[in-house]
């Protein structure tokens, strides 16, 4: 017995259905698609065809829009942070990486700390945004706030800076340079 002689058990692997290979196979001619019509053709078919009726997507009015520069923001309450401290999940310093793991968030998300609940522990929290009530509660408990400017994904792409430092450096503002008009020579 060797590797080349090993085979799956009989009946364990079902044979692939080969359609359109002649009428004798039982799946020839129309290849299981029936006769004529849009579903029998190749390529794209609209998922919902309502016949002559006005389709639902045209009956309903257009509504709102999605802003192109929208930021994905994960929110964390002060009460959640206190609970994590009591459970021993975080220490006195809470970084953006800690928030990412505890909130099960992605690398593209910004983090905002909200002031719902009470905070009794002294902590240093690094996040992108803080509500006024959260700032007050953290300061009242003797903690500190550190503002991050980049997402984890953006910080990883910054060359020449350590990861933690890249998180805390503000992004350079984009300055549009006006081109001078060329003078027409006469």
Swiss-Prot record:
This is Large ribosomal subunit protein uL15. Pfam families: Ribosomal_L27A. Signal peptide: none annotated. The keyword Repressor does not apply. One of its GO terms (biological process) is translation. Residues 21-35 have a biased composition (Gly residues). It comes from Chlorobaculum tepidum (strain ATCC 49652 / DSM 12025 / NBRC 103806 / TLS). One of its GO terms (molecular function) is structural constituent of ribosome. Residues 1-48 are annotated as: Disordered. Part of the 50S ribosomal subunit. Transmembrane segments: none annotated.
